[in-house]
Each structure stands twice: as C-alpha cells, then as structure tokens.
Amino acid sequence: MANEEVDRRAEILNAAVELFGTLGYYGTSLQKIADRVGLTKAGVLHYVGSKEGLLTAALDEVYDSETEDILTDIVREPRPLIADMWRRIVAVNARRPIQVHMFSTLSAEAIDPNHPAHEYFANHELHNADTALNIRWQVPEGVDTRRLLNA
C-alpha cells in the first residue's frame, strides 16, 4: 500500500474508533465515517472492505497492538512483576482515552451474542490470560499466580 493509502486508511480507522466509542457499532454508519473523513461510503469500503472489517481493524490494529506489545515485552523479561504489567497497561490506556472508550462501549454491546464483536470479546480475555499464565512471574512463595491474575 502506498503511503497516501496507508495514511487514508489510518484516518478512517481513527474516525471509526472515535465514532464506535461515542455511538457504538450499531449507531455508527459507514456514511458517518465517510462524512468525517471526506470520502464517499464506497471510498471507505475501498480501504476497509466492510463495516465488520472496519470493526475488526479498529480492535485488532488500533486497540490490541499496544496491549500485545506490553505482553510481548514482559514475556522477554526473566522474572517480571505482575504489578509492573498493570502499571504499563494503565499508563498506555491513560494515553489513549478514545481507544479505551471504544473498547468499553463495544464490550458492553458485544454481550449480545449476535453482535459482530461478540466472539472477539469472548476470546479476548482468555487469550490475554493464557499469555499471562505462561510468564514466569516473580511472586512470593505460596501465592497462586492464576488466582492473582484472575482477581
């Protein structure tokens, strides 16, 4: 993809993240996104394929990428502290309130099994928990890491 196309796609994703956070998935139309970025609805679809494709990209590429980076960094550490992971996550989320708002809004909507992000949210915590459980955390003797992470 050429730089201009990458920039335009990022602009579309940013608009979608903001609108999904404010209006939810069902309240956000492709036309609203198109109006926000100065394209036609067909122009938006050229970059993202479908509204569900846009939702997936907003969650995977915009929201999850930073969280995954934190877990990847922690996995490389010999004996990380669980509290350090939470501090990093809080610090990242404090810098991205719009993305956190989107995540919160969509997770509430996705309780409905017919929501297009239902599976994503059903599996999201399981994936992160599995990753976290495979890290050799530095915890005091006798502390159940699984129980601590699930608290």
Model-derived segments and their meaning:
Residues 60-66:
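Short, basic, alpha-helical segments at the C-terminal edge of helix-turn-helix-like DNA-binding modules
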Residues 19, 65, 131, 135:
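Short alpha-helical functional segments enriched in proximate histidine and acidic residues
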Residues 15-22, 69, 73, 102-105, ...:
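Solvent-exposed, amphipathic alpha-helical segments
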Residues 1-7, 143-144:
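N-terminal intrinsically disordered/low-complexity leader segments
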Residues 95-122:
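Amphipathic alpha-helical segments used for helix-helix packing
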Residues 119-123, 137-151:
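All-alpha amphipathic helical-bundle segments outside canonical DNA-binding/catalytic cores
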Residues 57, 70-100, 128-131, 145-149:
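Hydrophobic alpha-helical connector segments
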Residues 8-11, 15-57:
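Helix-turn-helix
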